[in-house]
A protein has these predicted regions:
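ABC family nucleotide-binding domain
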Residues: 2-205
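Conserved beta-strand-loop-alpha-helix hinge in the C-terminal portion
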Residues: 205, 213-229
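A cytosolic small-molecule/anion-sensing beta-strand core signal
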Residues: 210
């Protein structure tokens, strides 16, 4: 199975601080990998590098077979739009746009706008009945599903989710996890960043960070499913 991404000896230095120190691991296509660690372990710095919001001080980041370690500004933007879907704990929705328009705005940045594709994306996350609703008219779980639809509209190679259920109650957390499990079955590559050990167990493997170092990588033989929450 091919790699969706691979990190080779990644380091990130801020002044005298090594936020990431010699991080190496790979994520196979269609795999769900959970990245875990306590506060200050380097998770946020790693997400910034994986999502091309920042560059490593040293090391190589291979994304879909391409070296994404030191791209110029134009190529970085192109890679981010075409290869990566991002879901955050905060929703970052445009408050005065409808659910449909919030999905379509991601298409504008991709130079291809198709309302039917946006509708299908919302249908896939169970929001076909909320097309004209604004974010303030949606529940927290619905807003996060809208964010997932937006992140998937351009068919990225990998979905990076940073604490995606951090602001949700248990019922909505189950809905989001069920959706991620469905996406994995469809072959989508998922990288979930979380401090919650229970959520980490839904992945095919867990990458543990501590003090900026790779502490352990554990393969999960039988990943959890949402009805076990």
């Amino acid at each position: 199975m091919q790699n969706a991404l691979e990190l080779k000896n990644i380091c990130k230095i801020f002044g005298d601080v090594k936020a990431l120190d010699d991080i190496s691991f790979e994520v196979k296509k269609g795999e769900w990998v959970s990245v875990m660690g306590p506060s200050g372990s380097g998770k946020s710095t790693l997400v910034n590098i994986l999502s091309l919001m920042d560059t490593p001080s040293s090391g190589v980041y291979m994304l879909g077979g391409d070296d994404a370690s030191n791209l110029n500004a134009d190529d970085t933007l192109k890679f981010r739009r075409e290869k990566i879907g991002l879901v955050f704990q905060q929703f970052h929705l445009v408050p005065y746009l409808s659910a449909l328009e919030n999905v379509m705005i991601a298409q504008y940045y991709h130079s291809s706008v198709d309302e039917e594709d946006a509708k299908k994306a919302l249908e896939a996350v169970g929001l076909s009945h909320r097309l004209t609703h604004r974010p303030s008219q949606l529940s927290g779980g619905e807003q996060q599903r809208l964010c997932i639809a937006r992140s998937l509209i351009n068919e990225p190679e990998i979905l990076i989710a940073d604490e995606p259920t951090g602001n949700l109650d248990e019922a909505n957390e189950r809905i989001i996890l069920d959706l991620f499990c469905k996406l994995r079955k469809e072959g989508k590559t998922i990288l979930l960043v979380t401090h919650n050990p229970d959520l980490g167990e839904y992945g095919d493997k867990i990458v543990y960070l501590r003090h900026g170092k790779l502490e352990n990588i554990r393969t999960i033989e039988n990943p959890k499913v949402p009805n076990e929450i």
